[in-house]
Amino acid sequence: MDKNKTIRIALTKGRLEKAAVEIFENIGLDCSELKDKGRKLIFHDFKNSIDFVLVKAPDVLTYVEHGAADIGIVGKDTLLEMKKDFYEVLDLKVGKCKFSLASISSFKLNEGFNRMKIATKYPNVTREYFREKGIDVEIIKIEGSVELAPILNLADAIVDIVETGTTLKENGLVIFDDICDISARMIVNRASMKLNKDRITDIIQKVKNYVERES
């Protein structure tokens, strides 16, 4: 093990970024470069030999799985949708939301003989949910505003991430089932855990202690 080796941490851009930075600052890491990004792609904490990279959620999984990053911070939604090979080591208790089934108020989950159409950004999560219920559905992959699908009769219902439910209510949609809770997770590359066990375990423990204090 090289104690001076730089540990690379991949952070999810967007809603989880701020929460992750707050956590790392509170365990003593220097995240100042992340607050003055400019056009930089890699952000350094020279004192602690840490590099941060900001990438889209699916790419966090890819970077960590292939060893381009040692540690990743990503939402459980992405982990459930994209099965990859790494260690999931911590629930960070931030970025909390849930997967929910929603539609217009007249929707009936088990009524009728027609195969239901379900619109979602998360086809694998949706497929598994209905498989467990023994319901055969057609899944329509949507990249944009999923809430439009039942309103425009593209789909009977949607499966999407819900934080407050405000967007659903504003569009006349109702939650029919909460599928599972979601929050930010810490993941670690398998080889990195062996090669840099002491340093990575130290980071994990410090983050765990902080999360437990704040929970």
Curated annotation (Swiss-Prot):
Coiled coil: none annotated. PROSITE patterns: ATP_P_PHORIBOSYLTR (PS01316). Transmembrane segments: none annotated. InterPro entries: ATP_PRibTrfase_cat (IPR013820), ATP_PRibTrfase_CS (IPR018198), ATP_PRibTrfase_HisG (IPR001348), ATP_PRibTrfase_HisG_short (IPR024893). Its EC number is 2.4.2.17. It holds the Pfam family HisG. Signal peptide: none annotated. One of its GO terms (cellular component) is cytoplasm. Pathway: Amino-acid biosynthesis; L-histidine biosynthesis; L-histidine from 5-phospho-alpha-D-ribose 1-diphosphate: step 1/9. Keywords: Amino-acid biosynthesis, ATP-binding, Cytoplasm, Glycosyltransferase, Histidine biosynthesis, Nucleotide-binding, Transferase. It is found in: Cytoplasm. One of its GO terms (biological process) is L-histidine biosynthetic process. The keyword Manganese does not apply. It comes from the Bacteria. GO terms for molecular function: ATP binding; ATP phosphoribosyltransferase activity. The keyword Cell cycle does not apply. Belongs to the ATP phosphoribosyltransferase family. Short subfamily. Lacks the C-terminal regulatory region which is replaced by HisZ. Heteromultimer composed of HisG and HisZ subunits. Catalyzes the condensation of ATP and 5-phosphoribose 1-diphosphate to form N'-(5'-phosphoribosyl)-ATP (PR-ATP). Has a crucial role in the pathway because the rate of histidine biosynthesis seems to be controlled primarily by regulation of HisG enzymatic activity. This is ATP phosphoribosyltransferase.
